[in-house]
Amino acid sequence: MSRLLVGLKLAQSHYLSQLHKYPVATKAVTSGFLYLISDSLVQGIELSRDKDKKYDFKRSMRMAVFGFAVTGPLFHYWFKYLDKHFPKKSYRHAFIKLTIDQVVCSPVFNFLFFSGMGILEGKSKDDIVEKLKKDWLTTYVSDCVVWPFINFVNFAYISSIHRVTFMNVCNIGWGAFLAKMNSSH
């Protein structure tokens, strides 16, 4: 077996061990790291289009902080709540969970995202409210297009311990979208 495969197997084993021992912390760190990656991807695209622009490390770190402090822990407990009330691994329960997620959690999460990023950016309350008025609905509508399918797969086929990890991997693209929405003026 190649060294790369051995290394990947060891990393996977370590990650799964941490996920079982420290589920919230592991999901928080994973979310933070992947939000950093998402924003870095967006900035890479922006930099390739505008040579005068510079990489904004603080922006990427704000995304990482939000992923770490909000996304990982929030979805750990949210998915746990949904699993408690709809424990069957059935299409019916998956559909119920994704519907509740879209109607309850998604609007709140998108509000938290723009508010949290505004706070981390040092924006005033009025600026945050203006950002919410400008981008919240567009983001939520996009959320309703993207996430139901992902969450159906997540709730129907992914074991509960891996749901946040699966969401985080899918979230690389979504996080890039959020980073772009947040950086738009």
Swiss-Prot record:
Record localization: Membrane
Cellular component terms per the entry's GO annotation: cytoplasm; peroxisomal membrane
Pfam families cross-referenced by the UniProt entry: Mpv17_PMP22 (PF04117)
Membrane topology reported for the UniProt record: Multi-pass membrane protein
Keyword Membrane: yes
Similarity comment: Belongs to the peroxisomal membrane protein PXMP2/4 family.
Protein name per the record: PXMP2/4 family protein 4
Organism per entry: Dictyostelium discoideum (Social amoeba)
Source taxonomy: Eukaryota, Amoebozoa, Evosea, Eumycetozoa, Dictyostelia
